[in-house]
Structures are given as structure tokens and as C-alpha cells.
């Protein structure tokens, strides 16, 4: 039985969750490397999202603009995680931070949130779907291009082939 977590009714939770897992594995890793960040930098208070972008034509300025953009993408991801629900019944923020910032394993996170493996799997899927929804706000705030992560039932999705 699918649990309502305030997502669009026609979202394909399994496909969306897989797309978000892939995003964290590939895109987010790339953003961190490009930004010169370590995952622990995202949870530390000294991080300063200035949003300063240089628009000159010089090569050094272009490289800095690329770095600033990657830093803004990392900030958007972090804030999207922070915006996710975090209660005893919906520990979505805890799950996402534990997996993708602290790099804990699934079994460690399941123990941390004190749920059985099967219930944890459901909660993880819901957390990934909620992240897919919240990232839209933060990519607008930071004015960055981050791929669409939500996939829908009975629709042709952006970035997917139709059969």
C-alpha cells in the first residue's frame, strides 16, 4: 500500500526513487568534485552560499563561474534534504542525510531510525520521492540546472525513451 507523502498522485514512486538514487550516485558526486567540497562541508556552518557569479570572458573567470555553479548545486541539494520531513513516522531527512552526506549503509540507517528492513525500504523510497519534489524549489532559488527527478505514471517523462 502506497503511503501519502504529499506528492503528485501520478508520480511513479519506484522509478522516481531509482532516478534519485542515480542522481546521488552520479550527478551529486560530480557536483561535489567540481565544487571542491567534501560531503562533510555541506553540514558545516562555515559554508557560505554567496551566489556570486562572474560573467567575464576570461578563462580564469569562467573556471570560477563553473566552480560557483557546482557549489550552488551542492547547496540546493543540501537545502532540499533539509526541507524534507523529519519525524519519527517520516524520518526522511535523517534517512537522506545519513545515506548521502554521512555515507552510512542502509542497514546502519535502518538501525538509526529504528525500523525493520521492509519498513525502512518503504521509508527510503518515500524519502527519495520527497527529495525529488523539494529539489525543484531549491534549484529555482539557486538558479541552477539540476535534472528533473520525478517520473510519472502514464506519461512520457523528460529524459526517458518512450517504447
Language model features with spans:
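Short, locally clustered residues in the helix-turn-helix/winged-helix DNA-binding domain
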Residues: 82, 97-101, 132
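Short amphipathic alpha helix immediately N-terminal
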Residues: 87-104
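C-terminal low-complexity, acidic/polar tails when present
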Residues: 49, 54-55, 115-118, 126
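DNA major-groove recognition helices of helix-turn-helix
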Residues: 120-138
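Helix-turn-helix DNA-binding module
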Residues: 102-119
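N-terminal interaction/assembly modules
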Residues: 1-85, 136-163
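Short acidic, glycine/proline-enriched loop segments that cap or flank alpha-helices
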Residues: 84-87, 115
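Amphipathic alpha-helical interface surfaces
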Residues: 73-77, 91-92, 123
